A protein has these predicted regions:
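Helical membrane-embedded segments and adjacent short helical loop/helix-boundary regions
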Residues: 1-68, 79-80, 84, 88
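C-terminal ends of transmembrane helices
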Residues: 5-17, 63-76, 152-160, 179-186
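Short helix-capping/hinge motifs at transmembrane helix termini and TM-loop junctions
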Residues: 17, 38-39, 104-105, 131, ...
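Small-residue-rich segments of transmembrane alpha-helices in multi-pass membrane proteins
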Residues: 25-37, 57-63, 83-95, 114-124, ...
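Entry/N-cap segments of selected transmembrane alpha helices
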Residues: 73-97, 138-147, 197-203
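Transmembrane alpha-helix/helix-exit interface in multi-pass inner-membrane proteins
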Residues: 93-110
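Juxtamembrane boundary at the C-terminal end of a transmembrane helix
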Residues: 101, 207-216
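Alpha-helical membrane segments and immediately flanking helix-loop junctions
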Residues: 107-144, 158, 162-200
């Protein structure tokens, strides 16, 4: 069901070429409607999707290969890539926690949304370490990725960001794999740098969380 709906969503996105019809967003919407209309229990759906869920771990390991592939560009642009990922990851976590506190959503929601800009397996590991709620984390990760994929190209044009490395790093840091799919549409270098940024920002997020929790 998930694969079939996603394939349809990808076809629809390519057919319409609309950023609002993001494949992930369309897939989630269709599946939610389908589960509700046909009264399918969420537990049953989750059991059926176990195989897909089990691929999250190997998918994360592939990030190391993307770093290896782009090692020359990473070496020549190490400082701006590292600083960009560090600043982006820090701002993402601080803003998420700050907004949750501002609107009185509580520590549980705040801790669950901290890793929203990292890829799903890393985000789930971080939220598990913090004692957050996995379902909230996944919702935050998905929303962040979709919003990044939709608005990143617009923001790059708005602020006249022409450097392809900068575009890729910004997209990968703030909107992980969902944004990287959009970055690949923009160009090969943007997509590659976005993939590198996912891995680097994911590692930095883990280190920042470990450092913060040890201090607290």
């Amino acid at each position: 069901l998930s694969i079939g709906v996603f394939a349809f969503a990808v076809w629809l996105n390519r057919k319409t070429n609309s950023p609002l019809l993001n494949p992930l967003l369309v897939t989630v919407a269709i599946i939610m409607i389908g589960l509700t209309v046909f009264n399918i229990p969420l537990d049953s759906y989750e059991k059926g999707a176990t195989l897909i869920s089990s691929m999250l771990g190997p998918a994360t390991a592939v990030l190391a290969f993307s770093i290896y592939q782009q090692r020359k560009i990473l070496q020549s642009n190490f400082l701006p890539i590292f600083v960009g990922c560090l600043v982006g990851s820090t701002v993402s976590m601080v803003s998420a926690y700050g907004l949750c506190e501002l609107f009185g959503l509580g520590d549980q929601v705040a801790l669950s949304t901290l890793p929203k800009s990292t890829t799903a397996p890393i985000a789930l590991a971080v939220t598990g370490e913090l004692g957050g709620t996995a379902s909230i984390t996944m919702a935050a990760v998905m929303t962040t990725g979709v919003m990044g994929a939709i608005f990143s190209p617009m923001l790059a044009n708005l602020f006249h960001i022409k450097n392809k490395v900068a575009q890729g790093v910004a997209i990968g840091t703030c909107s992980h794999a969902v944004g990287t799919a959009k970055a690949l549409e923009m160009g090969k270098l943007e997509g590659a740098m976005s993939g590198v940024a996912i891995a680097v920002s994911g590692l930095l997020t883990c280190f920042i969380v470990i450092a913060a929790t040890s201090i607290m």
